[in-house]
Amino acid sequence: MLRIGMLMSLLARAAALRPAVVHVNRAASTRRAAAADPFAENRAPIVLYDGVCRMCNFWVDWVLDNDPTAKLRFAALQSPAGRRLLERSGRKPDDISSIVLVTPDEAFIKSEAVLEIGKQLSITTPLATIAQGVVPRAIADAAYDTIANNRYNIAGKRSYRDSDERLAERFISED
């Protein structure tokens, strides 16, 4: 009985968190120069990931290997570009608590970001679509939070990721 109560409490807290979809703060992005807009010339979504997390970097490598048509671009949360995109998405620029998928019009966080990324990859589209329809967001986010909060204990840290020369166009400039 105690475990069910703990699970219900965890689900209630997860449901009370901010929504997984955040509309872009147009006022903040308007204040920036047009040259700083990563969507000015390329409207492909941008995945913001923890640049020092081994597990996160392994996952980025897997996505790169399974996205041959370059539907997604990447920026480390800790990079200047990542910090600007976090602000544009209504998040604090030093918030590295969640993966973020940023599109020209909205941003997705936590499990919703993972599922939206999965829908971009032909290999995982069916699974992501089914999971999004079947698994309640509160449960998916609770599972995401458990992994995210323990990611350094699970896989450790590495030095800040440098983009591969062959894939430079897939990573947002570190200007």
Label each region the model flagged.
Residues M1-V21:
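N-terminal chloroplast transit peptides
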Residues R43-A44, K71, D95-I96:
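A structure-centric signal for secondary-structure junctions around beta-strands
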Residues P80-D175:
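Thiol/selenol-based redox catalytic cores and closely related redox-interacting motifs
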Residues G51, N66-K92:
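N-terminal G-site of the GST-like fold
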Residues V22-N25, Y152:
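Compositionally biased, low-complexity peptide segments typical
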